[in-house]
A protein has these predicted regions:
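Conserved hydrophobic/aromatic "anchor" residues
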Residues: 10, 25-26, 66, 77
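Short pre-active-site segment immediately N-terminal to redox-active cysteine/selenocysteine motifs
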Residues: 18-19, 25-29, 70
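The canonical Cys-X-X-Cys-His
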Residues: 30-33, 74
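Non-catalytic, surface beta->alpha helical segment in thiol-disulfide oxidoreductase systems
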Residues: 75-105
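A short beta-strand-turn-helix
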Residues: 3-21, 60-61
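Structural signature of beta-strand start/N-cap positions in the alpha/beta core
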Residues: 19, 48-50, 72
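Thiol-based oxidoreductase modules, predominantly thioredoxin-like and allied folds used
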Residues: 5-6, 25, 37-61, 68
Length: 105
């Protein structure tokens, strides 16, 4: 299950995490964001990646800091740094490829 993060919890939940973290930048009014959410849950489960969500309407500063111009935007963080990103609701395999996760066994 995804964890909602705010500017106050982002450093602890994402930047200081020991494992890779997939950050889903989304909004309540965004249909494609809701459509891709279960796909992201599966990717996180299959690849042992922590999944967190940032509501861009509530956390505009975070969205600006990471250059989020459209949603959904998913950014994979490794060792506290953005490692890969994908924009838009895409099929599971395309998201995995874009994030460099490969195919789960």
């Amino acid at each position: 299950m995804a964890t909602d993060v705010t500017d106050a919890t982002f450093e602890t939940e994402v930047l200081q995490a020991d494992e890779p973290v997939l950050v889903d930048f989304w909004a309540e009014w965004c249909g494609p964001c809701h459509a891709v959410a279960p796909v992201l849950e599966r990717i996180a489960d299959e690849h042992n990646v922590k999944l967190v969500k940032v509501n861009i309407d509530e956390e505009q500063g975070l969205a600006q800091r990471y250059g989020v111009m459209s949603i959904p935007t998913m950014i994979l963080f490794r060792n506290g740094e953005p490692a890969a990103a994908v924009v838009g609701a895409q099929p599971k395999s395309a998201i995995e490829r874009a994030l460099g996760l490969g195919v789960a066994a």
